[in-house]
Amino acid sequence: MANIKSSKKHISISEKRRKYNCSKRSMIKTFMKKVLFFIKEKNRIKAIKFFYIFQSLVDRYSLKKIIHINKASRYKSVLMNNIKKI
């Protein structure tokens, strides 16, 4: 454990940031599951609607470095290809 006051503050800040990032990653996964659910149900309109929301979230959080840019691109391309198959 850190003894210096600034180090203790940095640890608490890092913990807050980690919790924030985990919640945002969880939100991305939840929207991805919703899109996959509508793809499985063959509901193209709702799948596209949730895909656009998912796409904006992924783009926003990839720019903030919460997820990697290549991972964001991979998520979007996989989902869009699945939507096209409906």
UniProtKB/Swiss-Prot annotation:
- Alphabetized InterPro entries for the sequence: Ribosomal_bS20, Ribosomal_bS20_sf
Q: In its keyword annotation, does this UniProt entry include Ribosomal protein?
A: yes
Instruction: Recite the UniProt keywords alphabetically.
Output: Ribonucleoprotein, Ribosomal protein, RNA-binding, rRNA-binding
What's a Gene Ontology MF term here? small ribosomal subunit rRNA binding
Reading the lineage from the top rank, the first entry is Bacteria
> Which Gene Ontology cellular component annotation is one that this UniProt entry carries?
cytosol
The entry assigns this protein to a family as follows: Belongs to the bacterial ribosomal protein bS20 family.
Protein name (record): Small ribosomal subunit protein bS20
Species the sequence originates in: Buchnera aphidicola subsp. Cinara cedri (strain Cc)
Q: What is the lineage of its organism?
A: Bacteria, Pseudomonadati, Pseudomonadota, Gammaproteobacteria, Enterobacterales
Gene encoding it? Answer: rpsT
